[in-house]
A protein has these predicted regions:
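Predominantly extracellular/luminal regions of secreted and cell-surface proteins
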Residues: 1-25, 99
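Acidic, metal-coordinating catalytic segment for phosphate/diphosphate chemistry
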Residues: 14-52
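N-terminal strand-loop-strand
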Residues: 39-75
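Conserved Nudix-box catalytic region and its N-terminal flanking loop in Nudix hydrolases
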Residues: 60-101
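Active-site segment of metal-dependent pyrophosphate-handling enzymes
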Residues: 100-146
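NUDIX/MutT-family hydrolases
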Residues: 137-178
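Compositionally biased, intrinsically disordered linkers/stalks adjacent to structured regions
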Residues: 179-183
Length: 183
């Protein structure tokens, strides 16, 4: 079942109840939904929704992957697929595709830990103009040993890093707070 505009709106609205100061940052998502834009496809509009996974291990470290296109370490995540059904499922699918981790993880909350709107440069090889991603990030914790098997077409490395290395201050603060609470 595809991710519906209603699901995206409900997820963003619930997120904004917990984080009302972020309403302006997410206005493009809400305006796109109000216009009836398809925010689920990678080739739609100046902004579309993506899903990301913040995976924390038993030691409190966060999994980063080296993204081949951007040539830097990022959190696992990517574009939505028709079969995802929910944004959390999309985040789990992306985690599994990029790292091979399909089991041994559990969400720490049914709500996103963070929604980050960021610019994506044009990709001439894929025929994609510059656009924005509204990356809906879910926080997961390992529930046992996990084995990483990279999707080498998109990913060329992985590292467990301290959550202190998360570049976004808001995400870093929320992940650190969740780790303290769940320990």
């Amino acid at each position: 079942m595809p991710i519906t505009p209603e699901h995206i709106r409900a997820t963003v609205s619930e997120y904004l109840v917990a984080h009302p100061a972020e309403k302006a940052a997410l206005s493009g998502v809400l305006e796109g939904l109000d216009r009836g834009d398809d925010l689920t496809g990678r080739n739609t509009g100046p902004l579309h929704v993506t899903a990301g996974a913040v995976l924390v291990d038993d030691g409190g470290d966060v999994l980063f992957i080296r993204h081949n296109v951007f040539r830097k370490y990022l959190l696992p995540g990517g574009h939505l697929e028709v079969e995802d059904g929910s944004l959390m499922n999309a985040a789990l699918r992306e985690l599994g595709e990029e790292t091979g981790i399909a089991a041994g993880v559990a969400p720490l909350s049914p709500r996103p830990v963070h929604i980050d709107v960021h610019d994506i440069p044009a990709n001439d090889a894929k025929g994609e103009p510059a656009h924005q991603h509204a990356d809906v990030r879910y926080l997961f914790r390992t529930t046992g040993p996990v084995e990483v098997t990279l999707q080498e077409e998109e990913v060329s490395g992985w590292e467990w890093r301290s959550p202190d290395t998360l570049a976004d201050a808001t995400l870093r603060q929320r992940v650190l707070a969740a780790i303290r609470t769940s320990s």
